[in-house]
Amino acid sequence: MGKKKNSKAYSEELTDTTRPLLEFRYGNPLFAIACHPEQSVIVSGLATGHMFCHKYNAAELKEAQLKRLRKHDAGSKDDRKKLWEVVEVPGVETSGVSLLWTTKRHKGSVRCICFDADGTHIYSVGTDNVLKKADTLTGKVVKKCVLDPGQNVKYTKLVKSATHPLVLLGDENGNVTVLNSESLEQTNLIKSIHNGDAINDIFHFAKKSVYRYISLGQTTLAHWDSRESNEGDFAIAADDKQAKRKVILSDDQEDEILCGTFVDPEDGEVLVCGMGEGVLTVWRPKKNGLADQLTRIKVKKNESIDCIVPTLEDDGCVWCGCSDGNIYKVHVNRGTIIEVRKHSKLDEVTFLDLDSEYRLLSGGLDKAKLWDSEKSEQLTPGSDADDRVSNSSPSAGKSSESDSNDSENDATSSGGSSDEDSSSDESEHSDASDVEEELVGLTREQIIAELDKDLVEESEDVEDVRSQRKRKHGADLPTNANGKKQKGKNIKPERSMKTHGIRRFEGL
């Protein structure tokens, strides 16, 4: 039996070399953030009630990063220097990032924001219990309503249906308010879903019905129809297991369920939930109707998984934002962590989202980072990629690019530029996760050269075997763009057969 690997060392081995493309630093606590589903736009809401809408050019940001890399000393061992764009909020514009508008949208703090399916409108709700619908590109409010006048209700989750004109609001009392997204009029109220505890998350259960949703709260998972009230459920005895209820609750998980998502929202086969004890629980609706979890995946002991999003790359993985400041990429079927990114050493990861090109956006109370889809070593100009090795497992990534009360016309645009050198703030050097290690010993090319040297002596035998195989099968050996690597894979079995098998003496 092999020696048990130290968990800390193992985590360091998985640390990814991907750098952020962009970082936002906020002067006030960040309470909500979301990416536009079709454009390279990010909207953030702060504790002061202000909202900021930024547009970014990913290609320009990447080019600026390459320029900084060229200036960076190739021989320097300090690869932790920030080489990405840093934008102060509020502050002036920088290269590749422009401020479309900013406004004080709510009295008190902004609690939740979300886009509609095509990103035309953005919805926001604040501690003033006012829901506002605004044009995304101008910031102008087109509709608003006051929720529960006179009630001291705090909203925790805001969701817009991707297919129907529905807006759902979850609050701290465990209620879900359903409104028409066009008129902002209430159409349904589902009360006290999780025994009166706060709604931690809401997401679509599309495989079951376009009107069905899943909510998470305290230690239970529930699913329900957004069109139907659950008033009749309170007349059913708690111990009556046969009665049909409008809200179907899972078993008590004995650990707080903080967030959840489907690994593939289109097929709806596997659901994962982030727990307060640092594990992912795996649920399969077809197995037991979401009555209980089936398996658990350990992510980080004594920490909590506060947010989660699917990668949407058909790789069976999800991104998990953890209270230790790390982002973990978890392969659900394997039950393993395959990548780790460091968001911050001091702050929790409380927000995760994907931009229009599936780049990851992570956020905490003081900053947000938009991560590049390429590894750092792929971006390094003039460096020998064969002499460097990434500590992370490979991941499949997409390399393409993402009123002041009632007079909401005060949404203003601002211009200006900032010094790029500000992005190298030394106090934040330790936050970056792009440190690479030198490979000790022979490089990959040197190893290949040594293998080729050994193969020269037996090249004739190899060719004979190849010709025999061609005659036998009538086809060439498979090749790909990386000819050297494929060649090594094809020759090695032949060498082992001739060295250790009887086939070597077939001609005698």
Swiss-Prot record:
Pfam families per UniProt: WD40
The keyword Methyltransferase is assigned to this record: no
Repeat is among the record's keywords: yes
Gene3D superfamilies: YVTN repeat-like/Quinoprotein amine dehydrogenase (2.130.10.10)
GO terms (BP aspect): positive regulation of transcription by RNA polymerase I; ribosomal large subunit biogenesis; rRNA processing
SMART domains assigned to the protein according to its UniProt record, in alphabetical order: WD40
Domain of life assignment: Eukaryota
Keywords: Nucleus, Repeat, WD repeat
Cellular compartments annotated: Nucleus, Nucleolus
Record's GO cellular component terms: nucleolus
Region Disordered, annotated ranges: 372-508
UniProt WD repeat ranges: 46-94, 105-144, 150-189, 194-234, 252-293, 344-381
Main location: nucleus
Ranges annotated as biased composition (Basic and acidic residues): 491-508
Family: Belongs to the WD repeat WDR55 family.
Protein name: WD repeat-containing protein JIP5
Species of the source: Eremothecium gossypii (strain ATCC 10895 / CBS 109.51 / FGSC 9923 / NRRL Y-1056) (Yeast)
Lineage: Eukaryota, Fungi, Dikarya, Ascomycota, Saccharomycotina
Gene designation: JIP5
